[in-house]
Amino acid sequence: MSLKLPIAVSMIARNEAHNLPRSLGSVADWVQEIVLVVNDCTDGTEEVAQGFGATVITHPWEGYRDQKRFALAQVKAPWVLALDADEEVSEALKADIHAFFHGDHEWFQGAMFPRKVWFLGRWITHGDWYPDWSLRLFRNGKGHWSGSPEHDKIELDGSVKKLRGDLHHYSNPTLNSHVEKITVFGDYFLQRQIEKGRPWSLAETLLRPWWRFFRAYVLRLGFLDGFPGYYIARATAFATFVRYSRLYENEQQTNHPSRSA
């Protein structure tokens, strides 16, 4: 058995017992530490994680970004691999990470790699969803969680190496689960636009959905992913249209409160 790498997996979870065997199973035998921060679990998430040797910490929900910040603060290992419960380190990525640590990792502060989504029975390898380069491996103390509530990301000062192995992502097991996210992300978008004081624009409402479809399906070759590629481009365009339409709705409700009551 090879020695474990000086890496801690940092993860947050709520009712992820069904996903943890895949995600933690892909790393448990070669990382030094697993830190899982949980909240409000009712499905045995804690017990499943402990079966993989994870340190499980219960912490009240603070939102995705801040919850991940708390999890990161609990890590002791020299390096951190930040994962979501619905992700899996592929064999190719595992090999790349091992090669990185047995090679030139001392010259870098972190590493990024492509994230590949399993959707509608196939891997998505084109369009807006791929390669989705993700910075997830970094020196402890050098990276921190930043970004917006729905698009949190690691920010890092220093050089970053690109690895080629894919991080597998099982984020949308059904069409229903994807459609539900349109409303959730629409809420975040509306809140951000209101905070910025940005007015509704008819031009953006009409043109942005068209552009998002054209970019995903044509420029980024989404058509090569068959019907799933077409669905993703269409759904992205529709989600964009809904977001800007909700901004219009909010302005109407603000300007005419008595009529919208």
Predicted regions span which residues?
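Catalytic-site signature of metal-activated, phosphate-bearing donor transferases
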Residues: 66-72, 78-83, 90-253, 260-261
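Acidic helix N-cap motif at the loop->helix transition within catalytic regions
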Residues: 21, 43-52, 92-93
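A conserved acidic beta->alpha catalytic loop
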Residues: 26, 38-47, 61, 84
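Conserved donor nucleotide-binding strand/loop of the catalytic core
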Residues: 32, 46-76
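Residues at the starts of beta-strands that form the adenosine-phosphate
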Residues: 6, 32-33
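Structural signature of the Rossmann-like NAD(P)-dependent dehydrogenase/reductase core
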Residues: 8, 38-41, 121
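N-proximal low-complexity "stem/linker" segments adjacent to membrane-targeting elements
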Residues: 1-26, 256
